[in-house]
Amino acid sequence: VSDRAAAEPYFAQAVDTDNDNFSARNDFGGYLCQSGRIEEGLAQFNSALRNPYNDALYISQLGAGACYVTVLNWKEAERYFLLALVGRPKLALALYHMAKVAFSQADHLRTRAYLQRFFDTGAESAASLLLAVRNELKLKASDLVLLHANRLRAEFPESSEASDMARLMATAND
């Protein structure tokens, strides 16, 4: 906690020293959002997005979307993640975030589609596989539940997600 608090003056100095430093604004925005200062964080991301020299808009869009996720504002989160995907349709992190947004809205077919696109990029994580298991359970697609569950057990056997999945599967079979 003290390291985080000590970092803030450096972030502030970086954006004050160079107002056009969109990378510093993205970093500061992420720091502020993770600190629960959502409005201030979003202001940093929006400033970075307005910068005509920002050649990595998708980073600012991902950051703003993630900031909205922390306050469960799925509509705004989705808007920013979709903007990131316009410029980079195979951006794995945006695809995964869109799957989480769709799942939170109980849109399980869309969740499946975004996860499939995510996996097609070659990306994979314990969290994404657990989300796939949870989603396919909702769709009652037992073959896909087993496929993702087996991948989770094989690739991430010691993860907390593998433990969560085991409990989830046990209750699903009750």
Residue ranges and their predicted role:
Residues A24, Y58-S60, A94, S128, ...:
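TPR alpha-solenoid repeat register
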